[in-house]
Amino acid sequence: MAGPRQETERAGLTVLLDTNVVIRHLTGDPPEMARRATRFLATKAELVLADVVLAECIYVLQSVYEVDRPGTAELMRAALAMPTITAETDLLLRALEIYELDRLDFAEAYLVAAVEFTDVESIASFDKAIDRVSSVERIVP
């Protein structure tokens, strides 16, 4: 099994991003890792930002860095706008919009956006906050 290696420029790679790389880039903390993360994000041909990583980034920005909801959404939109980032962009942007404007937790906002983008008809949940978004039906189990 291959071990870790220091990555420089290798065009044509497809690489999954971990939360810590995105957070270092967005926060500048700590400075040396932030510089490396920013350089890495700028030089890769295709970097995949998984939905779960974006969700964890939101959690870290809010809980560790105490970034407010609008600031968190803005930072994540900036990450999604990077030309090297590949993601379910439309779905995630809609989830961020719901998270920010309708004030749902990101997991519920993501579920609402997923319903809107698929042929799924409703969400089974006890969370009444979902009712703030009129585009989906919540079913109480």
Describe the residue ranges of each PLM region.
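Short, well-structured alpha-helical segments
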Residues: A73-R77, L92-L93
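Histidine- and aromatic-rich ligand-binding microenvironments
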Residues: L17-D18, L49-A50, L104-D105, D127-K128, ...
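Residues that scaffold the ATP/ADP-binding catalytic core of kinase and kinase-like folds
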Residues: R24-L26, V60, V133
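Active-site neighborhoods of divalent-metal-dependent phosphate/nucleic-acid chemistry enzymes
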Residues: G3, M82-S122
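A generic structural signal for short hydrophobic patches within well-formed alpha-helices
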Residues: V22, L54, I130-D131
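Short, well-structured N-terminal submotif of metal-dependent ribonuclease cores
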Residues: M1-L49, V64-G71
